Amino acid sequence: VTGIEALGEVLRRHRRDASLSVELVESGPRLLPGLPPALDADLRRLCEPYAVNFRTATAIAAVSAQGVRLAEGTRLRSELTLWTAGLAPPPLLRESGLARSAQGWADVRPTLQSRHFDNVFVAGDAAQLPRAVAKQAYNAIDMGALAAANAARFLGGRALQPFKPAPKPVLVAFGDLQTYLVAGRTVLASQVLAAAKEGVHQAFMLQMAPGGVVSALPAAAGRLWQSWRRLALPQLLSLADFRKLPDCKPVRRL
């Protein structure tokens, strides 16, 4: 998702620059491999007017100041390379003994308790559950709350509770060209949804505000209003823009 959203922001700012040429390299078989396949086709359609070339099922061997070398030997010259690859476990996990598997993440039980140290609980991207969950902010926040609660239960000699990931919709912003709401196999697309994505982001940030929700609320409300004014209001007169991608289940129009 990060690479696609970065491309959207590049096109937002520079798509009218005739000298712009973009190569997007994806190791997976298609764009956004963890989301419905129709997103791949729709993103490619949106990029047709611009000098964007997609290379899927392609691995990168090296990155230098001059460009990128692909695993199959091709060299892509670049004035600017944006690296938006996925996650890598920090060495601390293995050095501390929390991670002992080949993947390098901290091995935890369903309760987020370390498999190697009973008095350690691990939350967020660092935790490797028996049944993998998406390494996303919404899961990390829920895991943090459960880890704290389970630590208290552990100290009190009470039974620990397992982590149960709650299914949540995903919002993918593609600059000012499109925003997608993905809920399971259902996808809704509209530029109006860009403000909704900002709203979700601000809601997550409020949960982690150092001074608490009340003190952070005015600033968050101001940022949300700015995004609504810039991103949503210009589109409200054209609600017909809401559309469903072709291979997804029918959904009620917003």
Per-region residue spans from a language model:
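Rossmann-like dinucleotide-binding cores of NAD(P)H-dependent redox enzymes
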Residues: 6-58
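C-terminal auxiliary extensions adjacent to catalytic cores
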Residues: 176-254
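A conserved FAD-binding loop/helix module that cradles the flavin
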Residues: 93-94, 126-175
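FAD-site-proximal beta/loop scaffold in flavoenzymes
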Residues: 75-142
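A conserved short coil-to-beta-strand element within the FAD-binding core of flavoproteins
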Residues: 56-67
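Hydrophobic/small residue at the entry helix of a nucleotide-binding pocket
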Residues: 2
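FAD-binding beta-loop-beta segment adjacent to the flavin cofactor pocket
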Residues: 104-121, 160-163, 176-187, 193
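Glycine-centered tight beta-turn/hairpin loop motif at sheet-sheet or coil-to-beta transitions
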Residues: 71-73
